Design a protein with these regions (language model features):
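Iron-sulfur cluster-binding cysteine motifs and their immediate structural context
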Residues: 44, 61-66, 70-92, 102-120, ...
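Electropositive, gly/pro-rich neighborhoods at or near active sites that engage anionic ligands
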Residues: 103-144, 148-150, 410
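Gly/Ser/Thr-rich loops at beta-strand to alpha-helix junctions
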Residues: 138-142, 165, 211-221, 240-242
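Glycine-rich phosphate-binding "P-loop"
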Residues: 168-196
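A short alpha->loop->secondary-structure connector
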Residues: 226-237
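Short, charged, surface-exposed secondary-structure boundary motifs
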Residues: 241-251
Length: 444
């Protein structure tokens, strides 16, 4: 429906400048993508697949590792462990005892077909909790807290991520009481350091489980447990996880500049003191307080650049898909622009998810929305891996290089380029508007 915007001598400039109805465009693109996907899947199935590799283990496949630990859990001879590689958890296989049985390959979320669903086939809701105290401690609208709360009072255990104040790491924990829910509140912006260790606790749990995780973690653990009735999966809208080395560099910066010490440090990655959309990061420690907006804070600048994510993040399979029952995140876009305390985007992907949301909807303002809001305002395609990726990861591992030097070398040039392009677009739009106005005056 955009053929009239192809430029030729008979096209009037004011027609080209008219606003495009992107909702209509995106709906057409979504239908065409689905057709293409079905065609490719049918072609693959018709071909019958390939023979199993002789070396049938995850380390012999040219696929990224997200550190979920599913392979480690199913290995019958404990040949796999999760090593730290450049600040990321990564599977390592002991070839001396590996049986090449293929069990690790079968559960790897990056190998084989996924039983995931398209986000566009889900039901989109907005959610904002009625309890102001819940909103203030939550990164957005409080939906994660409310899901966990409802789970606890219904007799479930909750698996989620907390920030370890002593080790400055994100950790996945299992909680059993309402008093522990606040440990899970707030964004972490780090890869969980022990997700692989929680799988055994899920297996041994004597109650139903509500399990929060990144899309790749959920995909991995679901390959182990499947659609068991006693597990509800909730994945998070995820842009990527930075290297733990970013946090190490960041704390060295806080220590050097502001006198922080590595002991009992609380970090609010999304402090709402100036509002939900402002995105401040605040650090607290025994009377010391550091607080800065994202465009000036070194941790945020590195995270937002997208230059130091895990290799797996650049090949994510779940930007517009999910293996979970519910997906949650911030409701970005124009619909709630100006909201001070936060609103959640909630995508219901299954009947189990719908039943859970139905139980909690009266705790807040829960409204049906158009799924196109997700496709228009969330990151539905992978970010490009920078050509200097190996270099920046190496510099992050180098103790003699500061976080300021890394930002100056890699991030600042791109920030300047983006700022220049933004200015040029504004000037161009202003000139075009003046030309249209001038033409209209002459015609009169």
């Amino acid at each position: 429906n955009l053929k009239n915007r192809l430029y030729n001598e008979s096209t009037y400039q004011h027609e080209i400048m008219e606003e495009i109805n992107y909702q209509c465009v995106n709906e057409i693109l979504t239908k065409e993508r689905k057709k293409s996907e079905n065609y490719l899947l049918n072609a693959i199935e018709a071909a019958g697949g390939s023979e199993i590799d002789k070396d049938n283990s995850v380390d012999r496949r040219n696929t990224p590792c997200c550190g979920c630990g599913a392979c480690q859990y199913v290995c019958p001879v404990q040949a796999i462990k999760m090593d730290n590689s450049c600040g990321f958890k990564k599977a390592s296989v002991n070839r001396k005892i590996c049986l090449n049985c293929g069990k690790c390959v079968n559960v790897c979320p990056f190998i084989g077909r996924q039983e995931s669903k398209k986000i566009c086939d889900g039901k989109l809701l907005s959610y904002k909790d009625n309890d102001r105290a819940v909103l203030l401690r939550s990164s957005s609208g409080g939906i994660a807290y409310r899901i966990a709360y409802q789970g606890i009072i219904s007799g479930c255990y909750i698996v989620g991520c907390k920030f370890n104040k002593e080790q400055l790491k994100a950790e996945t924990i299992l909680i059993k009481d309402k008093e522990s829910i606040n440990e899970l509140q707030g964004s972490k912006y780090l890869q969980s350091s022990n997700f692989n260790q929680i799988i055994k606790k899920v297996q041994d749990a004597d109650k139903n489980i509500i399990l929060f995780g990144t899309p790749c973690q959920i995909a991995g653990i679901k390959k182990i447990f499947g659609d068991k009735k006693d597990i509800i999966y909730v994945d998070l809208i995820c842009h990527g996880v930075p290297s733990q080395s970013v946090m190490s560099k960041y704390f060295e910066y806080l220590k050097r500049k502001y006198g922080f010490v590595k002991k009992n440090t609380d970090i609010l990655f999304r402090d709402k003191k100036y509002g939900w959309e402002k995105r401040y990061i605040s650090v607290f420690q025994e009377g010391k307080i550091y607080s800065e907006e994202k465009k000036k804070d070194p941790f945020y600048r590195l995270f937002e650049s997208g230059f130091c994510y895990s290799n797996a993040c650049y090949e994510c399979r779940w930007r517009d898909k999910s293996n979970a029952d519910i997906r949650i995140g911030d409701y970005w876009g124009g619909r709630f622009k100006g909201d001070a305390s936060g609103v959640n985007m909630v995508v219901v992907m299954s009947q189990k998810g719908a039943m859970l949301i139905d139980e909690i909807k009266d705790y807040g303002q829960c409204e049906n929305q158009n799924i196109m809001d997700y496709l228009s305002n969330q990151q539905t395609e992978n970010v490009h891996k920078p050509v200097f990726y190996d270099s920046i990861i190496s510099d992050l591992e180098n103790e003699s290089i500061s976080i300021e030097e890394i930002i100056s070398k890699y991030v600042l040039p791109i920030e300047k380029q983006i700022a220049t392009e933004r200015t040029l677009r504004k000037v161009k739009n202003k000139v075009q508007s003046l030309n249209i106005l001038s033409r209209g005056i002459r015609n009169e």
